């Protein structure tokens, strides 16, 4: 029979786990430590660790507004939690009632595409970035209440041709649910009036 951890030991491990993965849910923590969700919440309160939504907001305040050039941050579908222009980016999208089909509670595909596509635009280090071509694959349906984490990696930057290839992989937990390859048009010769393209 496995010996139960002491409260102090469990709380230390819980704190380490959250520091390593700030996006872990209370449900996942409860399962990991084989305790109730209420116990996890009480432990978090005692340790002054905020709930998941607050932890996400805290991570997201890394001045992403100043980083993203190609579109206003509010136009990104999902919440950017990490970005390094022309390298990689991560966003989180919470599937809510307005994103699903009423009949089966499955997320409409265009929301997953929009999360991936807007993150592919945001990662481009130019004033103008547009999707020239995309190849996408939906791997499994995403349901109401699930959290989709999209990870974008810039594969190839061809500044002389004004093109960049971006790969997107979206996950629910550890499970891959969506993949995409986006060929992005980029230009620094852009003005608000739309000329100089």
Curated annotation (Swiss-Prot):
Q: Which GO terms describe its biological process?
A: fatty acid biosynthetic process; negative regulation of DNA-templated transcription; negative regulation of fatty acid biosynthetic process
Q: Which UniProt keywords apply?
A: DNA-binding, Fatty acid biosynthesis, Fatty acid metabolism, Lipid biosynthesis, Lipid metabolism, Repressor, Transcription, Transcription regulation
Q: Which Pfam families match?
A: 4HBT (PF03061)
State the SUPFAM superfamilies in the record.
Thioesterase/thiol ester dehydrase-isomerase, Winged helix' DNA-binding domain
Q: Do you know which Gene3D superfamilies this protein is assigned to?
A: Hotdog Thioesterase, Winged helix-like DNA-binding domain superfamily/Winged helix DNA-binding domain
- Molecular functions (GO terms): DNA binding; DNA-binding transcription factor activity
Q: Which domain of life is it from?
A: Bacteria
- The family this protein is said to belong to: Belongs to the FapR family.
NCBIfam families in the cross-refs = PRK04424.1 (NF003359)
Record function comment: Transcriptional factor involved in regulation of membrane lipid biosynthesis by repressing genes involved in fatty acid and phospholipid metabolism.
Query: What name appears for this protein in its UniProt entry?
Result: Transcription factor FapR
Q: Which gene encodes it?
A: fapR
